[in-house]
């Protein structure tokens, strides 16, 4: 079984409409959509926004449905200047940009007793790249950073780039999903479409281009599931 997680309704609606033999299951105020997509058994959920919401949803998904892997779909703000709205970013690793336990000898972004970064599954990365190349999307792979703030000012963006110069994009859930998968020893991949440029116009751009980003990220997941 393939687990699929998106934070917002727009990020899961397209995939939900493609699922056949759909069964809707409610667990602890989290809605799960179970069925088949490209003849693969899938379980899809809209987790809600932020690290705690998505950690709860991911844990419920894993404990209740026992997926073989997790795919995270959705949108992100670009931190790398080579990325534009509608482009695709595939994580090779993820990290928190808002965790700081350096007083105890940990790296910036590292949760105590956890890795500094969480590494995505290499096989899933290759499959995602193949799916992207088939459709000729503009895509990059690299570090995605997560935190419980929407990055909507130039100052926020500059702070993250200072602390994490390799970061390609920022969003609010991916690293919490990755940490949960790490705890359960489950492979994961993060695929995000760029909805904004994480700058002073990010709020306006996000609202305008969320649908475009949702379509692009859903298409990537759809193609990826075909190849798994």
UniProtKB/Swiss-Prot annotation:
Q: Where does substrate bind?
A: 77, 151, 172-173
InterPro entries reported in the protein's UniProt record: MTA_SAH_Nsdase, Nucleoside_phosphorylase_d, Nucleoside_phosphorylase_sf
Q: Name one Pfam family in it.
A: PNP_UDP_1
Described purpose of this protein according to its UniProt entry: Catalyzes the irreversible cleavage of the glycosidic bond in both 5'-methylthioadenosine (MTA) and S-adenosylhomocysteine (SAH/AdoHcy) to adenine and the corresponding thioribose, 5'-methylthioribose and S-ribosylhomocysteine, respectively. Also cleaves 5'-deoxyadenosine, a toxic by-product of radical S-adenosylmethionine (SAM) enzymes, into 5-deoxyribose and adenine.
Recorded E.C. number(s)?
3.2.2.9
Q: Which reaction does it catalyse?
A: S-adenosyl-L-homocysteine + H2O = S-(5-deoxy-D-ribos-5-yl)-L-homocysteine + adenine; S-methyl-5'-thioadenosine + H2O = 5-(methylsulfanyl)-D-ribose + adenine; 5'-deoxyadenosine + H2O = 5-deoxy-D-ribose + adenine
| Name by which UniProt lists this protein | 5'-methylthioadenosine/S-adenosylhomocysteine nucleosidase
Q: Which UniProt keywords apply?
A: Amino-acid biosynthesis, Hydrolase, Methionine biosynthesis
Q: What family is it from?
A: Belongs to the PNP/UDP phosphorylase family. MtnN subfamily.
Q: Give the record's pathway.
A: Amino-acid biosynthesis; L-methionine biosynthesis via salvage pathway; S-methyl-5-thio-alpha-D-ribose 1-phosphate from S-methyl-5'-thioadenosine (hydrolase route): step 1/2
- Gene Ontology terms describing biological process: L-methionine salvage from methylthioadenosine; L-methionine salvage from S-adenosylmethionine; nucleoside catabolic process
An annotated Gene Ontology molecular function: methylthioadenosine nucleosidase activity
Its organism's taxonomic lineage begins at:
Bacteria, Bacillati, Bacillota, Bacilli, Bacillales
Active site residues of this protein:
11, 196
């Amino acid at each position: 079984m393939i687990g699929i997680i998106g934070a917002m309704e727009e990020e899961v609606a397209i995939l939900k409409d493609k699922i056949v033999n759909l069964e809707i299951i409610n667990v602890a105020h989290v809605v799960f959509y179970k069925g088949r997509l490209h003849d693969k058994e899938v379980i899809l959920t809209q987790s809600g926004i932020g690290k705690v919401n998505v950690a709860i949803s991911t844990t419920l998904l894993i404990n209740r449905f026992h997926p073989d892997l997790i795919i995270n779909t959705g949108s992100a703000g670009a931190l790398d200047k080579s990325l534009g709205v509608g482009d695709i970013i595939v994580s090779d690793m993820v990290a928190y940009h808002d965790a700081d336990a350096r007083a105890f000898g940990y790296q910036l972004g590292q949760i105590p007793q956890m890795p500094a970064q969480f590494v995505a599954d290499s096989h899933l990365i290759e499959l995602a790249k193949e799916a992207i190349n088939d459709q000729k999307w503009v895509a990059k792979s690299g570090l995605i950073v997560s935190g419980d703030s929407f990055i909507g000012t130039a100052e926020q963006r500059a702070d993250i780039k200072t602390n994490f110069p390799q970061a390609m994009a920022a969003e609010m859930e991916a690293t919490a999903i990755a940490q949960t998968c790490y705890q359960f020893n489950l492979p994961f991949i993060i695929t995000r479409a760029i909805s904004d440029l994480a700058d002073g116009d990010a709020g306006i751009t996000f609202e305008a281009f969320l649908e475009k980003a949702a379509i692009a990220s859903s298409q990537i997941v759809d193609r990826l599931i075909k190849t798994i």
